[in-house]
Amino acid sequence: MSPANVDYLKTNNPQINPSIIEENPNSVDISKIMHKNTDCVEIRKQHHIPLDTTVFVYGGNLGKPQGLGFLLKVIESNLNNSDVFFVLVGSGTEYAKISSWFEKNKPHNALLMQSLPKQEYNKLLKSCDIGMIFLDKRFSIPNFPSRLLSYLENKMPVIAATDSVSDVGYIAQENGFGFSVLNGDLESINRYIKKLSENKSENKRMGQK
């Protein structure tokens, strides 16, 4: 649970003794993780991802709860931006809709892939620069997507476009490893995309947080 989950549970369940409610964050042993190396070039070549662009990746469930219509708007607004490349990996109820959008618009700077085996997905992540998290803005109960952990394992800054009650983006921004926007705020998310794509040294610094 995150702090927002704890607050929600206490507020909406007064019958529960608050002293027994604790935050238990997800964690990973980073000493066992192989970080980015020269293989990234080969991985990008394998998937036809440009070597000289900043790669933003969304990996995970492609379903209605993620509010991914906004992600498509983000890609559409950056169709002429040769400095960025978007990678979407996953499966779910919205995959067909997203695939249809890709077929229609044929974005030159975006790639849609179905779910990969874990080892292949982890390799792909190592070749990316920025992790992206999306949640439908209509959520009224806090969510904390576990995909954040995969991004942090690979020392990537994150952009979280979520509802107003989830605190995953707030935590990323407060701790210096990401930015938080409301799902649907195209101006703000593009401002952060521009900032991260133009300052690779800042990306590295944020990824070390």
Regions found by a protein language model. Name each.
Residues 34-49:
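A short helix/loop element that forms part of the nucleotide-sugar donor recognition site in Leloir-type
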Residues 50-66, 72-76:
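Conserved donor-binding/catalytic core segment of Leloir-type glycosyltransferases
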Residues 66, 117-126, 131-152, 157-170:
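Nucleotide-sugar-dependent
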